[in-house]
Amino acid sequence: MRGMETLTDAAILLARVGLGVVFVAHGWQKFFTLGVTRVGEQFGTYGVPQPFVTASIVAGVELVAGIALVAGILTPLAGILLGVDMAGALYFVHATNGPFVSQNGWELVVALGVGALLIAAVGAGRFSVDRALGG
């Protein structure tokens, strides 16, 4: 079933790149558009511990792990870190707002977090740096 394996690997590639680009955009926004100081201030209003430190860590995880997902390198680690990142966003910001993004709800963070964890579980697929390095 070579054709099915190729289809599976192509689907994993599309999922990795799609999720990775979204995370890169959010990390980039936190670092360079809003700035981590402003993000830290926002985090403080949500009761996030050490909000300025956490803002820097979250921005870094989203940017670096997002790039890792796109490339398919260290994919299980990147997926787990992003899943934890989204769990934090769910807990501190979105859980009580209902499901819809238009109301700052949880649907996007759940979809992103579950997607990242799924990629961590299934691996990067054949079209990845992980596979090229023998992983």
Predicted regions located by residue number:
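Extended, low-polarity transmembrane helix blocks
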Residues: 1-33, 52-60, 64, 71-135
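Membrane-interface interhelical connector segments
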Residues: 32-50, 54
